[in-house]
Structure formats: structure tokens, C-alpha cells
Amino acid sequence: MSHTIPSASVLPAVARRGFFTAAAAAVAAAKVVAAEDEYGPHAGPVRYPDYRLVELDKRFGKLKLGNTPIQRLYHSPNMLWAEGPAWNGSGRYLVWSDIPNNIQHRWLEEDGHVSVIRNPANNSNGNTFDTHGRQISFEHLTRSVARYEHDGTRTVLADKFNGKSLNAPNDGVVHPVTGDIWFSDPGYGALMDYEGTLADTGSVQPFQKEALYRWEASTGKLFQVADDINKPNGVCFSPDYKKLYAADTGASHYPDAPEEHPRLGHR
């Protein structure tokens, strides 16, 4: 949805004064926000509670600590697109992808050191860890779900469904009991060369209809869970692991969605 804002020249005198007053206030507020968003040795003091921590559902209020700030762990002008952060609780480190640069980084909790752990990284997007501590990456370039063993070797878990290539796996989670991997395949990484390789099919659905999948750990088989979501992107489990939530980043609307949240519905 877009809105056209009239220029000040076509507003009545009173409205123009209000327009410029509001604009000046917005600029001043933006400067305050920008100042508070600064990091590094010249940044101002942190204010509590951190205004950037916002709960859209009041039930999350009891989980928010008022004196907890957002901290920047790493910044580099060479990093183009940080995606797919995954925390390894045993190793106490964080990994993430820089999709266009085709690399993966690792941040160590012990000393804050950041290094490149995988180059190239097959334009990986999401990452997670299985119940054995092995890294799972969802790769655009190879259109596959890959597992990195403890010795560093790469094992392809899934790259086809019904004999056709996957589009470009995006994000996924591992069920802690079954070890199954649930992941999304919206196809973004096959629509351009910037974050993968452009598919030669000439379709916005490069090889498959956009879908959610489940890779079964006990058999190695791949099952399609749902294909009625426009662009399934980020996924996560409910706290009891009985529900899977998927973010739809496509321009879609559901007729059965509740009125207060028109973009949401029971899936």
C-alpha cells in the first residue's frame, strides 16, 4: 500500500505551518535516534530501557529485561548482507552468512574474535545446528540443504524433490527430538545472480512451486509439507515444538485471517 503526500505548495497556510512544524520535529527526532544508534568509542551513553526493544504482544513484556541493551558484535564496510545467524551453545560461537560475498563468518564469545570460516560458502542463507552440533546450511548456489561434518566435509541432505531441483533453500530448523529438518524454499536465490544464480527457466517459480519441506533424519527422505504459502521464508518452532511458524514475505492475503492482523492466519 502506498500513500501520496501532497507538496507544501498546495496546502493551505495553516496546514503548511503544521506541515513544516511536523517535518522539523521529525528531523530532530531522527537526529536523536541516529545519535543513540551510534556504536564504538565515540557513541553516547546507553539509555534504559533500550527503545529498540519493542514487544508487539504484551505477553512478551515479562521476558524483556529493562537494563538489557542491543549490542553490536561486529561491523565491517565490506560485509554486504548479514543473514542466517545460528548460535552453537556447546562451542559458544555464532555463525552467519554474507550472501553476496559468498562467505560465512564466526564470532567467538570468549574474546569477540571474528573470522571467515567458509569461503566460498555457496551463497548460503540460513544456518542452524543439528542435535550432534553439526552445522546445517541452506544454500542458494547449489540449491541444496547441506550438512558440515565435524571433520569439515560437506554432505548434501536434499537438493531435489520429485526429480526436480529445489529452487534455493532459504531457512530451516532442526527438531530436537526427531532430528528432522524443516525448511523453506521460496526461490529468491534463483531469481538473480546477486544472491545465487539466476535460473534459466524464465519463471518466478524457478524449478518448483514455493514450499515448505521436511527432511526426515531417520530415512533421509524429503517430504513437502505445504505449497500454499506465497513466499515461505523464515521458520521457527513453538516453544513445545508442536507447531511450525513460517513467515510469508510474498504479497499475499488470507481470507480467514483475523481482522486485527490481516496478514496473519492459521496455517
Question: Which functions belong to the PLM regions below?
Answer:
Residues 51-55, 69-99:
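Beta-strand-rich domains and repeat architectures in extracellular enzymes and scaffolds
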Residues 63-75, 113-120, 151-163, 211-231:
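Blade-edge beta-strand/turn elements of extracellular beta-propeller
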